[in-house]
């Protein structure tokens, strides 16, 4: 079991690592919330084939397709 001194040393080590430029891999732009259009564009480019397959299935009428679109848009809210 770690002692309090070891826990403090571990926290210091983590803090030092986070301050090291080698560990700062995300730029400010990468950590900013994407716009809805950027989010939807990325989503459709990554999962375009799957979404197109779903769209073409007979079980998807207009209402269900709209529900799918709104559900995908709702995923954008995780960035708030």
From Swiss-Prot:
Keywords: Nucleus, Ribonucleoprotein, Ribosome biogenesis. Residues 11-26 have a biased composition (Polar residues). The keyword Ribonucleoprotein applies. The keyword Nucleus applies. It is found in: Nucleus, Nucleolus. One of its GO terms (biological process) is cytosolic large ribosomal subunit assembly. Its main location: nucleus. Residues 1-10 have a biased composition (Basic and acidic residues). Pfam families: Rsa3 (PF14615). One of its GO terms (cellular component) is preribosome, large subunit precursor. Required for efficient biogenesis of the 60S ribosomal subunit. Associates with nucleolar pre-ribosomal particles. This is Ribosome assembly protein 3. It comes from Schizosaccharomyces pombe (strain 972 / ATCC 24843).
């Amino acid at each position: 079991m770690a002692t309090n001194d070891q826990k403090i040393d571990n926290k210091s080590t983590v803090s030092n690592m986070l301050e090291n430029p080698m560990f700062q891999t995300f730029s400010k732009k990468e950590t900013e919330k994407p716009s809805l259009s950027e989010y939807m564009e990325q989503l459709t480019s990554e999962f375009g084939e799957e979404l197109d397959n779903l769209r073409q299935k007979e079980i998807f009428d207009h209402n269900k397709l709209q529900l799918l679109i709104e559900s995908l848009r709702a995923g954008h809210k995780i960035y708030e």
